[in-house]
Amino acid sequence: MTANAYDVIVIGGGISGLSAAKLLVDSGLNPVVLEARSRVGGRTYTVQNKETKWVDLGGAYIGPTQNRILRIAKQYGVKTYKVNEEESLVHYVKGKSYPFKGPFPPMWNPFAYMDYNNLWRTMDKMGMEIPKEAPWRAPHAEEWDKMTMQQLFDKICWTRSARRFATLFVNVNVTSEPHEVSALWFLWYVKQCGGTMRIFSTTNGGQERKFAGGANQISEGMARELGDRVKLSRAVCSIDQTGDLVEVRTVNEEVYKAKYVILAIPPGLNLKIHFNPELPPLRNQLIHRVPMGSVIKCMVYYKENFWRKKGYCGSMVIEEEDAPIGLTLDDTKPDGSVPAIMGFILARKSRKLANLTRDERKRRICEIYARVLGSEEALYPVHYEEKNWCEEEYSGGCYTAYFPPGIMTQFGRVLREPVGRLYFAGTETATEWSGYMEGAVQAGERASREVMCAMGKLHASQIWQSEPESMDVPARPFVTTFWERNLPSVGGFLKFMGVSSFLAAATAAGLVACKKGLLPRC
């Protein structure tokens, strides 16, 4: 082979691209990784400084059933620790704070409780109909894909409190608005993360743990192992498949050649690349139609854990339109040092507040923390970190790309479909924990096996492989109560009461008529 010639070119040095390259090397192949940034990690980004020791400004959370990322972390000796949830969480709504335990805030209004319960139960039930590997094949795919989550919430929610929390549920999980996302896509997204409880929970859920020392250790470990196969500051500008080898050009005028290419970047970033021949129509239209979510990740550091002294763990669920933050988690180091609270500015709020100065965002965040926690100590941080992922040229947003109405059924089937000698990875193409680091690993390794299958090195039946459960982070089932399984919806309850009232009235009228001899055989 000539210089800059490889078996496979992997475009994207995030977790997905690096895990793809790692598997190729482990299988005896010679890949190269081209990363546009001056660092590896993609949408994971760990910063080290004296104030924070280390801080994850990007993807950070892992939990039970995320077995692939846990396997790779273990290979590099990266330990996990549990996000603190020993004390009470806080639900802030209508200007008041309500401590609670568990993944979801309790509802004391019986109608609101029925509405909340029916919301989660209905989403999980609908998700059961959706195949993880092909959501467009769901029995009601066309109907659900034409509907936004806002329309679905309007259809199944009776109370304002349920609709309000449902909006936050979408904001938190996919950093977009209910009116922006397809119901089919969002229901699939929740389903492939294990359901409403698994995706939203800290304990036993997707946010249970973090990596001690930061999530970027995973990418850095793979990059060290790959050595000079990883090329930084190599933004790809063109891919030419017309020759015997695929030719990839970078903006710094380097040329790389290989038999196959794996694109391990968000679908929308394909628009930065010129393709020869042009992409097929559906693929070309898909990459124009899947925007990225919007989020600013914010860490506020304090002298001490004053919230724990008040009996709070640091998790806040904040339902107030003027509040910048929607959800927080404790971000204190596992040894108890560097007390901090992590908060997300989500979706519409991240776009609205992006024009503020950094100091103004910090001030507003500290003010809402002071109100929610009932402590003026929140007003006096010792340090602040933030990352607006919407300004990242080579991400375009975070956490993941989302599908607006109508896109999944028309274009979803080409998301992973190879184009000639081009194969597609990236967390968006995963079928388990898409949008998370776990999905990035699944997608990268699957794309590598697709390439090896094309090379004749393995059978097609070996492309998709399940992962053994992590023994270090076992998953526990979520147990529902009798009432959670059988409590009627508000609509069902009112219908039952209406029928019951009618029957009671009819019975009373019948008794009166019978007593007066107006009915025969009485």
From Swiss-Prot:
Record flagged with keyword Mitochondrion: yes
Main subcellular location of this protein, as a coarse class: mitochondrion
Residue stretches spanning the membrane: 493-513
SUPFAM superfamilies found in the cross-reference section: FAD-linked reductases, C-terminal domain, FAD/NAD(P)-binding domain
Domain of life of the native organism: Eukaryota
InterPro entries reported in the protein's UniProt record: Amino_oxidase, FAD/NAD-bd_sf, Flavin_amine_oxidase, Flavin_MAO
PTM annotation (S-8alpha-FAD cysteine): residues: 398
Keyword entries, A-Z: Catecholamine metabolism, FAD, Flavoprotein, Membrane, Mitochondrion, Mitochondrion outer membrane, Neurotransmitter degradation, Oxidoreductase, Transmembrane, Transmembrane helix
Tissue distribution of the protein: Strongest expression in brain and intestine, followed by liver, heart and gill. Little expression in spleen, eye or muscle. In brain, highest activity in noradrenergic and serotonergic cell groups and those of the habenulointerpeduncular pathway; moderate levels in dopaminergic cell clusters.
Disulfide-linked positions: none
Activity regulation field: Inhibited by both clorgyline (selective MAOA inhibitor) and deprenyl (selective MAOB inhibitor).
Membrane topology reported for the UniProt record: Single-pass type IV membrane protein
Listed GO MF terms: flavin adenine dinucleotide binding; monoamine oxidase activity; primary methylamine oxidase activity
Assembly behavior: Monomer, homo- or heterodimer (containing two subunits of similar size). Each subunit contains a covalently bound flavin. Enzymatically active as monomer.
Miscellaneous information on this protein: There appears to be only one form of this enzyme in zebrafish, whereas in mammals two forms (MAOA and MAOB) exist.
Record protein name field: Amine oxidase [flavin-containing]
Biological source species: Danio rerio
Source species taxonomy: Eukaryota, Metazoa, Chordata, Craniata, Vertebrata
